[in-house]
Design a protein with these regions (language model features):
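Conserved N-terminal beta1-alpha1 strand-loop-helix module at the mouth
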Residues: 1-88, 142-143, 147-150
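Glycine-rich phosphate-binding active-site loops on the catalytic face of alpha/beta enzymes
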Residues: 65-69, 88-103, 150-165, 189-225
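Glycine-rich, proline-tolerant flexible connector loops at the mouths of alpha/beta enzymes
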Residues: 30, 34-50, 69, 94-112, ...
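Alpha-helix-loop-beta-strand connector modules within alpha/beta enzyme cores
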Residues: 45, 49-71, 106-133, 166-193, ...
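Catalytic cores of alpha/beta
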Residues: 52-53, 71-85, 136-147, 170-177, ...
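Hydrophobic faces of well-ordered beta-strands that scaffold small-molecule active sites
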Residues: 8-16, 39-43, 62-68, 94-96, ...
């Protein structure tokens, strides 16, 4: 099967989340994401306003900010504060990390209550919840999937890219098999090539998170899968 690179890009959140990311890096990433019509540019909380400003200059591009990133174990109040600030700065999408430790400890009610609060705060915006699958058992992945679906989030996202592993075909297939109505899948972490990204889209993902697919040397062509 063939898939155009431009289609892959249209489903990709172009990320600039490395610890050394600067304001200039974010502005450049925003311009590139807009130029090639990515789904969004995904940036640290402190640079959301800069990305929004660059997006106004560059043209149509959505700005996504991350919260509770990358470990997920800040308090619910801290996540709410972080998200509220990003929405005020102009973010249209939020990628927030699940409290992985609470999930693994069986504190289901805590996780459920937090997710409901975050969904209420982001009503009218795109909310993606990062499950960080590399740390979860199969049963925990399915529990995360259910809780994220029940809260009304838009996406379950596989990984931050900062854990012990990234997106896998096995995890995406598992999520796709048990996916609740209305929930979509974002694969992220370790996706380095267009071929990898295309495979995840074929498996049923609606979004890809990647930092290395776009550059000024991009050339449109079809991908052989």
């Amino acid at each position: 099967m063939d898939m155009k690179k431009s289609f892959v890009i249209s489903r990709t959140d172009h990320t600039v989340l490395k610890q050394t990311a600067s304001r200039a890096d974010v502005e450049q990433a925003t311009l590139i994401a807009a130029r090639f019509k990515a789904a969004s540019v995904c940036v640290p909380p402190c640079y959301v306003e800069d990305a929004v400003r660059a997006a106004i200059i560059a043209g149509q591009i959505r700005v996504c900010g991350v919260a509770g990133f990358p470990n997920g174990y800040v308090s619910t109040d801290a996540k709410i504060f972080e998200i509220a600030g990003m929405l005020e700065d102009g973010a249209e999408e939020i990628d927030v990390v699940l409290n992985i430790g609470a999930l693994k400890a069986g504190e289901t009610e805590y996780v459920k209550t937090e997710l409901e609060a975050l969904r209420a705060l982001t009503e009218g915006y795109i909310l993606k919840v990062i499950a960080e699958t590399c740390f979860l058992t199969r049963e925990e992945k399915l529990l995360a999937l259910k809780l994220i679906g029940d809260c009304g989030a838009d996406f379950i996202k596989t990984s931050t890219g900062f854990g012990g592993g990234g997106a896998t075909e096995e995890d995406v297939s598992l999520f796709k098999r048990y996916l609740p109505d209305g929930l979509k899948i974002k694969a992220s972490g370790g996706i380095k090539t267009f071929e990898q990204a295309a495979k995840f889209l074929l498996l049923g993902c609606d979004r890809i998170g990647a930092s290395g697919l776009l550059g000024n040397d991009f050339i449109e062509e079809e991908i052989k899968i």
